[in-house]
């Protein structure tokens, strides 16, 4: 069983609808119930900001500060982390530039947010993801990249560096500046970063596929088959240096086409994650809404197990409205599967009775009007 990473305290100041709130946690799962709009998801968002990035809502930091506050917000968490007990503080101060947030680990300023992954891994599932299989391909790429990030924290830096290089290329092409040596340098950088991104995604899909293959057939959630499409399809068994050369050549040959289009038409930013319901041999987008939700739950749980297996530390799960559309039997099975992962989960819902099968495996909190009771 992986080591259990768990929060013991969470304190928020001027965060969303919370002027100040403090939760004492005992390592069990945490169930947050209350009316819609009470602030349950806000608490989940705060926990999600203990990982690199902008959290489960991807909100601008300036939008997170409580309306009516002087400005800024803070999050403090104490936890039994991957390297032992640790205290993490993050937020922005009044009047600060809001594109970045401050981060302190045990009171010391962190150099980058990637340092958070030394202490915990966070995975989440929210109602906003329910349309993942039918929505835009960019949503599926973002979902896959978060899966990769949980095991390869450098993936985020590669992706942002690729985007930056691509914007530089697009700007040169838009301005009609076809300097071959300048463009070639940018395209070589894009090729190195882009192929590394694509290979990391492919590796994640392979790891998940092997784990799903080993799953018992009696699982209450359907299994998914996964593949990438739209960039260098079927080519990734070749040496990476050959792939980089091919992609760089592709970019060089498509300069005038991309200039006319106003964007780069080939690259990992154009790939799509294709998901099938294995048992039905059906594309996920053609499955019923309930089947899509069950597929997504099964996929997130498989990934959580993979993270625990490969790191030796169970990830913390944030499961927003997870029980809303599951019958009683499937809810109970879900809670058992979450238990089997060996970690701590935060779950939300409007009705506490939907979580009764957890019994004493969880702490129960009631959320109302910017306050938490329990």
From Swiss-Prot:
GO terms for biological process: DNA replication; DNA synthesis involved in DNA repair; double-strand break repair; SOS response. It is found in: Cytoplasm. GO terms for molecular function: ATP binding; ATP hydrolysis activity; single-stranded DNA binding. Gene3D superfamilies: P-loop containing nucleotide triphosphate hydrolases, RecF/RecN/SMC, N-terminal domain. Its main location: cytoplasm. SUPFAM superfamilies: P-loop containing nucleoside triphosphate hydrolases (SSF52540). This is DNA replication and repair protein RecF. It comes from Rhizobium etli (strain CIAT 652).
């Amino acid at each position: 069983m992986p080591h259990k990473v768990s929060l013991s305290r969470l304190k928020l100041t001027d965060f969303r609808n919370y002027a100040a709130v403090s939760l004492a946690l005992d390592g069990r799962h945490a169930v947050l119930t209350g009316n819609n709009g009470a602030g349950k998801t806000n608490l989940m968002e705060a926990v999600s900001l203990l990982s690199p990035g902008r959290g489960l809502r991807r909100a601008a930091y300036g939008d997170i500060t409580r309306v009516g506050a002087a400005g800024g917000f803070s999050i403090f968490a104490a936890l039994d982390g991957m390297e032992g007990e640790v205290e993490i503080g993050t937020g922005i101060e009044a009047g600060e530039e809001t594109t970045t947030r401050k981060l302190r680990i045990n009171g010391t300023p962190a150099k980058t947010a990637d340092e958070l992954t030394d202490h915990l891994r966070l995975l989440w599932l929210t109602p906003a993801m329910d349309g993942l299989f039918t929505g835009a391909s960019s949503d599926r790429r973002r979902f896959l990249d978060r899966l990769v990030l949980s095991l390869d924290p450098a993936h985020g830096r590669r992706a942002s560096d690729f985007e930056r290089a691509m914007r530089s290329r697009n700007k040169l092409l838009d301005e009609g500046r076809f300097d071959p040596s300048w463009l070639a340098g940018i395209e070589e950088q894009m090729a190195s970063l882009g192929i590394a991104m694509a290979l990391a995604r492919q590796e994640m899909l392979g790891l998940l596929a092997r784990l799903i293959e080993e799953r018992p057939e009696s699982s209450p959630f359907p299994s998914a088959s996964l593949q990438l499409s739209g960039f260098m399809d079927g080519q990734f068994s070749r040496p990476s240096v050959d792939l980089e050369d091919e992609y760089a050549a592709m970019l060089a040959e498509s300069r005038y086409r991309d200039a006319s289009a106003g964007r780069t038409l080939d690259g990992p930013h154009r790939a799509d994650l294709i998901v099938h319901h294995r048992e039905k041999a059906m594309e996920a987008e053609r499955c019923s809404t309930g089947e899509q939700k069950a597929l997504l739950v099964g996929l997130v749980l498989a990934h959580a197990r993979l993270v625990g297996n490969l790191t030796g530390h169970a990830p913390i799960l944030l499961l927003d409205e997870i029980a809303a559309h599951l019958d009683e039997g499937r809810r109970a099975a879900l809670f058992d599967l979450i238990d089997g992962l060996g970690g701590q989960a935060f779950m939300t819902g409007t009705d506490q009775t939907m979580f009764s099968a957890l019994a004493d495996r969880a702490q129960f909190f009631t959320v109302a009007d910017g306050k938490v009771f329990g």
